[in-house]
Structures are given as C-alpha cells and as structure tokens.
C-alpha cells in the first residue's frame, strides 16, 4: 500500500533522519576504507561501489520513514581482466550488504562452471542446488560465468544451471545476491544470449587494466606484507619487467605480479645461499636486488 500525498506531506514535515548518524551505525565507511587500503588504483570501481552503497543506505532510510519503493536490484556483474580485484571487491560488497541487512550472513561463495554443471543427465540440478544452499544468506560469485552457456552444444548442461539460477534470482532475491564475473567482451555476449538473466542484473561494475606504475605499487605492497623490499634499482628493473610482461600472453595483472615476486624471492634465496660468507644480515634477508629480477626469462629473449 502506497503513501497518500497527505501522509507523505506529514512525513516530510515531522520526520527527521540524521543521515550521518545512520551511516555511522552501519560501519560501511570501515569497509570502504579497507577497500581503499587493500586495492591500489581502481578509482572508477571504488566510486561505483560507493554509489551502490549510497543507494542501499538511502533505500533503507526511506523504508524507515515509511516511504514505499521497490527493493533495489542487488544482483551484479563485475567485468574486466583477471587479477584486477574482482573477488576482493565482491567480498567487500558482501560485507556492505550484510551491514545494511540486505543479506543475513554476509559470506562469499566463489564458484566456476565446474562447481555448477554436471557431466551427465540429472547431475547438474543437484550440483547447482548444493552450491546455492551453501551461498544462501550471502553472495554467490560466479567467475568466468560465460562458460555456463555453450550455444554450439545443444546437449550441454550449462543451460540447466542457468535456469535454476534464474529461478533463484527471481524468487529468492531476499536470500541471495549473485555476482557474475569475467572478461567484458565475453560477458556482453553471455548477457545477449541470455536476456532473462541480463534483465535481472541491475548493477554493472567495470574493472580496468592496471597501469604499470600501479602494478609496481601492488608489488611493493605484497613485498612489504612479507617483510621484503626492493632496492631503487630493483624498482626500476621490476617496472621494466611489468611493461614487458604486459605484452606477453596470459598476463593477469596482480596475479602475474604475485607470480613474478615469488620467482624473485626464489632467486634472492639462491643468491643468499650461494654467498661466500655464510654470515648474513637482516638487510641481506629482506632486500631484493635488481639481479634477482634480471634473471627472468623476459630479459633473456
């Protein structure tokens, strides 16, 4: 039942809502601050998440003062290349939804096609339903969601999983939020082929590629967490490494940076182990030199 003009007028005149106080109660700012600290760059993504959080908060305040409106669509699409923070942002989004009482538990369940689709008749439905059962009350994050749909194979069971997801998205919106993720071009085709699903996804967040300088900062942050550091020369060499690696196949942004760091640590350990003097300082153990990076195959091709 909607609010009459008279009732709305009374609400406007006599109901005061302290927006800052309500915002502080939710502790959403803590989540947004964590997002800023944990993720380098990605300003458009952070702004979009803040916009979604603002919509959800205002919707809750409207309900509080008796204003009627349909619930905002909560299902989302995260598009962008791998290693750009989609899973991290999904975790924070789950926390925001929980703090605003849109979901009951606030946990994140991450899956791919293999977790949902069976290999024979009658196998897909129980697999998908089991995943949904685990995710209820939280957020289900489906990575590389486009692999659910294989139009060139009429016997593929992915379409069965999609049908079950559609039913849950429509009928259990209060119990579960689904985030579909993957490369933008492939996700666009996926939605075009599944208009029923696309119409139920209200929030789209595009994750851009990192710039080389941002990836260097990510590397330094990863190293700092492990109590390592790069020399100034090593910083320049690592930046050069990133630029070269970005031109190679299967580049995965922060994931590729993490892999490069792991290999640099291995070379660093071998260099330390092979020192003529077996007495090493704390600085020796924590400092990665340019040579630890220059031994990469990228510099030898």
Curated annotation (Swiss-Prot):
Report the family membership.
Belongs to the CbxX/CfxQ family.
What Pfam families is this protein classified in?
Answer: AAA, AAA_lid_6
The gene that this protein is the product of is cfxQ
Q: Which residues bind ATP?
A: 80-87
What protein am I looking at? Protein CfxQ homolog
**Record-linked InterPro entries:** AAA+_ATPase, AAA_lid_6, ATPase_AAA_core, CbxX/CfqX_mono, CbxX/CfxQ, CbxX/CfxQ_RuBisCO_ESX, P-loop_NTPase
Its taxonomic placement starts with: Eukaryota, Rhodophyta, Bangiophyceae, Cyanidiales, Cyanidiaceae
Cell location: Plastid, Chloroplast
As for what it does, the entry says: Necessary for the expression of RuBisCO.
Task: List the NCBIfam families hit by this protein, alphabetically.
Answer: cbbX_cfxQ
